[in-house]
From Swiss-Prot:
GO terms for biological process: L-histidine biosynthetic process. It comes from the Bacteria. NCBIfam families: histidine_hisI, PRK00400.1-5. It is an enzyme of class 3 (hydrolase). Keywords: Amino-acid biosynthesis, ATP-binding, Cytoplasm, Histidine biosynthesis, Hydrolase, Nucleotide-binding. The gene is hisE. GO terms for molecular function: ATP binding; phosphoribosyl-ATP diphosphatase activity. Pathway: Amino-acid biosynthesis; L-histidine biosynthesis; L-histidine from 5-phospho-alpha-D-ribose 1-diphosphate: step 2/9. This is Phosphoribosyl-ATP pyrophosphatase.
């Protein structure tokens, strides 16, 4: 049964901030790219290049995983915000716009995850991966 056959689950608080906050955050990060790295955390991260930004994203992701496994909901929420922020910094560093990702998510909507994953070409084998210096 595909995702399209399930009714949407209503939000508990529809007035709460939504995914548009990610678009605004991305715009802020993009604007700060040209800022002084001594004044802006985003500018400092971006000045280090995509490899270091990706490494920082990985570190934040692991912290998020640890809190999920530990069952610490409050810390998981905080770490999730960190992960989303660092993901957006990585997008800016790599030249990815949010709408690129939203379009890909829209393309996948209603397709079984197993079917969608099987349709992807093998982009990188495990043997080709390398540690970021």
């Amino acid at each position: 049964m595909g995702a399209a056959s399930h009714p949407p689950v209503p939000l508990l608080n529809p007035a709460a901030p939504n995914a548009q906050v990610l678009d605004r955050l991305w715009s802020t990060i993009l604007a700060r790219k040209a800022a002084d790295p001594l004044v802006s955390h985003s500018a400092r991260l971006l000045s280090r290049g995509v490899n270091k930004v990706a490494q920082k994203f990985g570190e934040e992701s692991v912290e998020c995983l640890i809190e999920a496994v530990a069952g610490n909901r409050t810390a998981l929420i905080a770490e999730s915000a960190d992960v989303l922020y660092h993901l957006l910094v990585m997008w800016v560093a790599a030249g990815v716009r949010p709408e690129d990702v939203w379009l890909e998510l829209q393309r996948r909507e209603g397709i079984s995850g197993i079917t969608e994953k099987a349709s992807r070409p093998m982009l990188l084998s495990i043997a080709e991966t390398r540690k970021i210096p």
